[in-house]
């Protein structure tokens, strides 16, 4: 197993901002909050993260020291979240998404084979969510 050095959350957030993203400080996995590791704890984070300056981003480390995870503000960023546990179906759905939407270098695998494909948008979009699908044997 190879050990990878994780970037300091502030350095990561500043780099994301420099590359045109809006970083969001997110609760660390050990915090005593609902959805720990996935939930922003900053009040009004949707507004504050939209135009946070580098100085503001540096302050987050002091104001929210337990928010060690980092999310990205959507709107001009969308994700195709493929939460399918069959590798063959995940691959087929991801291939179809890439054929329709185009290739993307932004790919995240959490619990394999589930995958999220990230795309930048030309104009902001509201969240679109499909109904949950249940497959029977």
Each PLM stretch: what is its role?
Residues 1-137:
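Conserved phosphate/metal-binding and DNA-contacting active-site motifs used
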């Amino acid at each position: 197993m190879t050990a990878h050095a994780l970037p300091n959350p502030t350095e990561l957030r500043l780099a994301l901002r420099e590359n045109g993203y809006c970083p969001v400080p997110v609760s660390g996995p050990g915090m005593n909050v609902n959805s720990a590791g996935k939930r922003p704890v900053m009040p009004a984070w949707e507004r504050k993260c939209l135009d946070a300056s580098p100085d503001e981003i540096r302050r987050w480390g002091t104001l929210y020291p337990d928010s060690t995870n980092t999310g990205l503000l959507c709107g001009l960023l969308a994700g195709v979240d493929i939460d399918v546990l069959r590798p063959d179906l995940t691959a087929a759905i991801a291939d179809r998404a890439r054929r329709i939407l185009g290739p993307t270098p932004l790919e995240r695998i959490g619990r394999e084979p589930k995958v999220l494909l990230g795309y930048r948008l030309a104009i902001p979009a509201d969240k679109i969510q499909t109904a949950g699908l249940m497959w029977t044997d």
